[in-house]
């Protein structure tokens, strides 16, 4: 066969497009209806997170506080009390706060409310079941009555612990704030209401922190993702509530709706000036009362 002298053309080479490996970020929060609501869009892939992939971990807040102290988690929910011991390693995300505006952790008891609950709790004869010594609820209790005696009990067992007579009173967080009367317990003090009477400010209870070694750019990206998740949940409330119901620990839908409404609010989208002032005031008062080792420099990262 004779050659035509023509060279066969090579097919054009396909350009290889570099695909950035997804960055895996471990994000931890408590298995509660309010956290489930705010993280739903992120967990369900409803928002664009670019090359960031989130792995969700669940744990009770005291366990998360302890893990954050060890630096184990890149992003996690923590108590604002615990943040006082984390500020050198973690920054506080400006989004995802649990802030009670004239309501918060509640001190309940089998006995009816005395004329002076503060004096009764400080007399030394009563034992209060608390959900953890790093919780903000515990810090608020100690600001209210430093002499209160306490025993640490898992947060979801406190009501039963008090009903059974193992403690005289219980410090309730999460959904227990709505269910104590079902067990015949009596409200002695709402610490969020007390705090507002004292300061005129809401009570900041929990927030989300990000480890500083991730770098400024990634911390801001994470903050944007979290803010977008909260805003998406608020814009699609019915769907987010349906997801949160699975974490309601037996609460009926109306109570889940009420609880989420209490702790997923405007402060959750962003602390804002009032929320930031409340954090500073809480930590400053705790430091002056000798409940913290020293002043706390709070760094907020916003998206």
List each model region and its residues.
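Secondary-structure end/capping motifs
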Residues: 215-285
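Compositionally biased, low-complexity flexible segments
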Residues: 1-16
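Pocket-lining segment of extracytoplasmic ligand-binding domains
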Residues: 156-246
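A short beta-strand-loop structural module common to alpha/beta enzyme folds
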Residues: 48-63
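A structural signal for short loop-to-beta-strand junctions that line the ligand-binding cleft
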Residues: 25-26, 89-97
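Bilobed "Venus flytrap"/periplasmic-binding protein-like clamshell domains
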Residues: 22-44, 58, 105-169, 175, ...
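Beta->alpha turn/N-cap motifs
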Residues: 60-62, 71-84, 154-155, 172-178
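Periplasmic-binding protein-like
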Residues: 100-106, 182-212, 258, 266, ...
């Amino acid at each position: 066969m004779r050659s035509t002298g023509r060279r066969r053309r090579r097919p054009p080479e396909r350009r290889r497009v570099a695909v950035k490996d997804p960055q895996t970020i471990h994000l931890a929060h408590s298995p509660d209806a309010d956290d489930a609501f705010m993280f739903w869009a992120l967990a369900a892939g409803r928002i664009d997170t670019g090359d960031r992939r989130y792995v969700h971990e669940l744990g009770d807040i005291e366990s998360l506080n302890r893990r954050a102290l060890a630096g184990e988690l890149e992003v996690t929910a923590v108590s604002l009390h615990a943040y006082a011991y984390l500020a050198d390693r973690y920054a506080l995300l400006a989004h995802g706060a649990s802030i009670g505006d004239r309501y918060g952790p509640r001190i309940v008891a089998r006995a009816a409310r005395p004329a002076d609950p503060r004096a009764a709790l400080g007399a030394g004869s009563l034992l209060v079941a608390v959900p953890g010594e790093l919780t903000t609820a515990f810090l608020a209790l100690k600001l209210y009555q430093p002499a209160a005696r306490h025993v640490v009990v898992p947060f979801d067992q406190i009501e039963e612990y008090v009903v059974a007579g193992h403690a005289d009173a219980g410090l309730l967080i999460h959904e227990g704030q709505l269910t104590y009367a079902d067990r015949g317990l009596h409200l002695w003090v709402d610490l969020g209401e007390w705090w507002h009477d004292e300061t005129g400010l809401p009570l900041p209870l929990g927030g989300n922190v990000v480890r500083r070694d991730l770098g400024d750019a990634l911390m801001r990206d994470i903050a944007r993702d979290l803010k977008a998740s909260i805003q998406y949940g608020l814009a699609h409330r019915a769907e987010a509530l349906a997801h949160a119901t699975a974490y309601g620990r037996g609460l009926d839908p109306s109570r889940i709706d009420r609880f989420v409404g209490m702790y997923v609010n405007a402060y959750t989208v962003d602390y804002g000036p009032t929320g930031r002032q409340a954090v500073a005031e809480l930590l400053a008062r705790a430091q002056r009362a000798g409940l913290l080792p020293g002043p706390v420099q709070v760094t907020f990262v916003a998206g």
